[in-house]
Amino acid sequence: MLHRAQSLLAHYFGYEKFRSGQDEAIRLVTEARQNTACIMPTGGGKSICYQIPALMFEGTTIVISPLISLMKDQVDALEEAGINAAYINSTQSNQEIYERLNGLKEGAYKLFYITPERLTSIEFIRILQGIDVPLVAIDEAHCISQWGHDFRPSYRNIEILFRELHDKPVIMALTATATPEVHDDICKQLHIQKENTVYTGFSRENLTFKVVKGENKDRFIDEYVQNNRHEAGIVYTATRKEADRIYERLKRNQVRAGRYHGGLADDVRKEQQERFLNDELQVMVATSAFGMGIDKSNIRFVLHAQIPKDMESYYQEAGRAGRDGLASECVLLFSPQDIMVQRFLIEQSEHEEKQKQDLKKLRQMVDYCHTEDCLQRFILMYFGEKEPDACGQCGNCTDTRAAHDVTREAQMVLSCIIRMKERFGKTMVAQVLAGSKNKKVLENGFSDLSTYGILKHQSVGEISDFIEFLISDDFIRMSDGTFPTLFVSSKGRNVLKGELSVARKEALKAAAITENDELFERLRMVRKEIAAEQGVPPFVVFSDQTLKEMSGKQPVNDDELLSIKGVGEQKRAKYGRLFLQEIQAYARMTD
């Protein structure tokens, strides 16, 4: 049976062998007919685990997903590969839904995608009772657990299937973010024996994780986006206001930027999302509302401009980078005042127990920002992996920046804060240290302080950056409230007493992630033109990974093209000639 599965994989998807865990998951549902849980990292190929069995079984596989935007992309990709599939959701007209339900009754589809809310429809359950449903795949299965970071009560509707379908289908639950408690809950809710779990770990070896502390965020984002101007990326923020601010800044810098958050109209969000998927926008600035169901495989970087609320959210959002397996970066820009933003959002909850749980998770997120250990290892241990190895490539593992003693400068700043009675914010303190003639500085008599102008060889901006560094290393703390004031921590007072020294590493450079060759860029243009004609996102035609391999191997005929990962029979027949022509034209030009 596995031989047939491999043959289908090559024919439809263009891959010669399964990735880790895929063959075991397929065996459990097709041969053993066991309800199965798949815990695999984002980009680990979870969808193949149910798409191949769907092709092997008679009847229609039902796929339950909360991600409306993902449904269309996945169905487009399946149809591009020559597989009959459809979806229904709330974005469609009654006529469209009626036609697709008729197709479902007639057995026209191998896979049929729905949201969990659809299971409350008596009419829909009756249709399922009248057709052959061999397999039900439940994507984003962590949504069924009250212990998960994204619990959705609608997922409890899945219980209806167990009650109402006489011929019990095999259940497959899939997730990329499940702590041990969430895993237990998934198995309990979906009648899965824990030993029937395919677990390939959470490690994403193609992702490089970094935490940037004590740096000017705006400058870092500007330089990073400029250095990676040919790559797609997402900048996440905790609030709509910050998303709007960064978006406007990038637009002023001539960046092809979009924005996405709950304060925008539905049609605006949809238009921005489609432009990003179609490579018309380089960068999307967004709150956590964006990304659930984004199957764009060539996102090369994810920057978090503010700390997320918990590790599950962070890993899920960061994990949208590099889904095609190519090298990508996930950078978290840490600033202590961002903790207060998340605390405020958490404290809006009326449930005391949930508040306590969420504050504990936020504390773990802050620990991640301060750890000097391997960042990938910290994440894996959070998700329950025992003694994972250091990744050797994250910002902490590869940090060779020289550290300079800045104790004297730190004492100047700390002394100034105390002399200002610890009643003012960062900008005012920086202005006093720089010797500013600002009206407020003079009115408050700060020009008479011994620390006035003591750092006049630096700009107010440079001093503000240095204060940010002292805050991030807990020498200075900030009060709560809309206009936070600075006060010296006990650690900072030890510096003033001469009992503790302060060392600062050189600023982290915003470097380019990868260098792309000319042929790869030409193949990307061919792909973009085809995608525009077909009305699908470019990655649905071929992934960046497939184009990279084409660029490296430069196939000259159909057989050689079929040996490239991601080129199946259908796509070879449909697009092969255009890509081979471009490769041949490039070869002639460079001879």
UniProtKB/Swiss-Prot annotation:
BP GO terms, sorted: DNA recombination; DNA repair; DNA replication; SOS response
Domain Helicase ATP-binding: 27-196
Annotated localization: Cytoplasm, Nucleoid
KW Zinc (keyword) present: yes
Chain ranges for the short sequence motif DEAH box as given in the UniProt record: 139-142
Cofactor: binding details: Optimal helicase activity requires 0.8-1.2 Mg(2+) per ATP molecule. Bind 1 Zn(2+) per monomer.
Protein name listed in UniProt: ATP-dependent DNA helicase RecQ
Species, as recorded: Bacillus subtilis (strain 168)
Phylogenetic classification of the source organism: Bacteria, Bacillati, Bacillota, Bacilli, Bacillales
